[in-house]
Amino acid sequence: MMRKALLALCVATAFAVAQAQNVAYPNFPYCQCIKSPSPYSLEPVVKSNRTGQYCFTLRVTKPSPSATGYCATKADIKKIEINVNQVCDVFGNVVNATLNGVPTKVGPAFDTPPDGPNTSRILRFTQLNLGLDSDGAMLCITLGQNDKGKGCTTLEDLCAPPAGAPKGTCSLALFDSKPDCCPISRVSPPAPPPPPPPPPPEPVAVPITPPCKTCVYATITALPPLLFPFQLTPSICQSVADKIAGDLEMIVTSYSIGYSGATITCSGNVIKVCASFSLPPGAPYTGLQADISNALTFWLSLLAPSTGCPAYFANHQVTVTVGGDGDPNSVTCLEGTATTTCKPGNPDFPKCECETKPAATRFAALPTLTQEPGRPSNRTNSTLYCFTLQVVAPLNPNGLCGNTTTLLKAELWGNDIPTQRRKILALAFKAAGASSPLRYLSPSWGSAGEQTLKVSGLNWDASQADGAKICMELSNDTNLKTFCNTGQDTCWINLFSPDKQCCPLFAASLTP
């Protein structure tokens, strides 16, 4: 009997652990969506006209002429979801809602997010039909109990507050019709009536402002479809974190604030930089918050420059958030968010008609370039930049391109103006598993104006291509930004099938 009980306990425990490990989105709003920029927010303090009724006021900031992107300029509001406690999800009609004094078209509903933890709950208000002309719209909810006395009647009972926030703090996500966008607002219940003034206190020493621990989170999130998911490397983490830590110290110490130094953590695809500091007694955080907000755009550009994302971030979202120690949504004395979505490039290359879609064939190139010093025998100092090939599952294994079993040749996008033609000293390649060193070839260009470098005569099968190298040896008096026509440290290569009808195109970038 004891053995059966132990066995049942082990099975239940394993199931619970498996469930916990399979949660796709552990934090509100428990789905993948774009949180900023957005013209929509809610007033930070809820209005309460009577017991059990709470009203949320929408604020719409008209998009600036320079704003871009659907979420920043065109999104509507179809539904609003509140992060609530599981215990409030009871049988019966315990929540009623009005929009601008009229009952909502669809009644409020509790739900369990399909991709969130089993214990998570949201309260949904849908078919709201709000937009850029809805500034001041008011959504009011009335909380009650069912006939068994069950239900949450205050915001303190209803809302699941963010980490570190007091009870009654509510997180609300404003979803558009697609839904792609979900700006998040945090609101608090109205303050209670002030107590009668106390008698004059005895003179006491001015207390020291408690320390503020602020963290900067840089998060890279994959967006399918995806051939090569990004994996954060120690070099990228350290390079980005060092710059953020240096900026934090410079900003904080400019206010004559005690600064304890930064701690750096890299976990998964999240870079986390935290620091603690204290303002002098009575000093506001206003100026410090403004400087932190201004720094967000620069910190975002460390990973995703405004000139274009590196190739290894294609189909990824990069977000920089300022919050408390815990997770990016934790509340602290400072806050802010900046985000961008990196899309694959679309160069005017190759100059022939063929299928360029990545994974059209089984032959692919990784999105990272390697570099090393060029041959010492050259008359000029040089650097070797190499693509690394990999064999992948083709998109359509039974199609013309998917059936390709041989890599005939490769072509690289290069700047063929006369001054740049002379900057490439050689092309080189090496099959996977080959015992011989790189084989060097004189550069072979296409017709003038085609900007095409050719690496012919490969004829590799899958075993030779999986891990093979194709390289350019460039003089050090040029750089990839100029030679590869991209304005950044990114180059393009396509890989041809024997019939030249299939030529999947790939970008690769240097890493810090």
UniProtKB/Swiss-Prot annotation:
It is found in: Secreted, Extracellular space, Extracellular matrix. One of its GO terms (cellular component) is extracellular region. Disulfide bonds: none annotated. Pfam families: DUF3707 (PF12499). Keywords: Extracellular matrix, Glycoprotein, Secreted, Signal. Its main location: secreted. Glycans are attached at residues 49, 96, 118, 378, 381, 403, 476. This is Perphorin-1. It comes from Volvox carteri (Green alga).
